Regions:
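Vicinal oxygen chelate
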Residues: 34-38, 82-150
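Flexible, glycine-rich phosphate/dinucleotide-binding loops
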Residues: 58-61, 84, 160-163
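Positively charged n-region of N-terminal signal peptides that target proteins for export
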Residues: 1-5, 20
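N-terminal beta-strand motif that seeds the catalytic metal site of vicinal oxygen chelate
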Residues: 18-38, 100-103, 157-168
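Core segments of cupin and vicinal oxygen chelate
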Residues: 23, 30-75, 79-80, 137, ...
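Sec-dependent N-terminal signal peptides
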Residues: 4-13
Length: 168
């Protein structure tokens, strides 16, 4: 009994220690699609994703729908069209190939993340990629765009502190 309790106790300590180690987590994927309406229908029906508000001003050429898939994970679907509502952005012609635009991650501290990026990324240390410039999302969160060693875009957003309730 004591041995079982001790093993259970050690498991919880190890779990909480590993949970505290990561300061970044997966946030969203942006996919370019050929038909936004059918893609939204697919993800909302098959995966029971919920639509969420798009926080930027609308554009007639760039049509976007944001979906919440599970807890804290988003799928952003986009479609580029011309004035005649025809898709203008070339997508991979191979069926089943993702139209991946960028990966999105959230971090606890943008400053700490940038320091780590500049310290550990050979491409940023060597000057292959310039240090990213911090921008802000419409709701105020710090954001940057970086690239991985293959040149894939990664969108990094600093987590906003949760508002404290004044009701007691």
């Amino acid at each position: 009994m004591i041995k079982s309790f001790l093993l259970l106790f050690l498991f919880f300590i190890a779990s909480s220690a590993s949970a505290q180690k990561s300061t970044a987590w997966y946030h969203h994927t942006l996919l370019d699609v050929q038909n936004l309406e059918s893609s939204v229908a697919f993800y909302t029906q098959v995966f029971q994703a919920d639509t969420i508000p798009y926080p930027f001003p609308p554009s007639p050429q760039y049509i976007v729908k944001w979906l919440k898939v599970g807890e804290g994970v988003e799928l952003h679907l986009s479609q580029w069209v011309n004035n005649n509502n025809k898709v203008i952005r070339d997508l991979p012609s191979e069926p089943g190939h993702l139209g991946l635009v960028h990966l999105g991650f959230m971090v606890m501290s943008m400053d700490s993340f940038l320091t780590r990026l500049m310290e550990v990324s050979t491409d940023y240390k060597s000057g292959k990629y310039k240090q990213p410039i911090i921008d802000r999302m419409p709701y105020g969160a710090k954001t940057i765009e970086i690239k991985d060693p293959d040149g894939n875009e990664i969108h990094v957003i600093e987590a906003m502190p949760k508002k404290r309730s004044t009701n007691r």
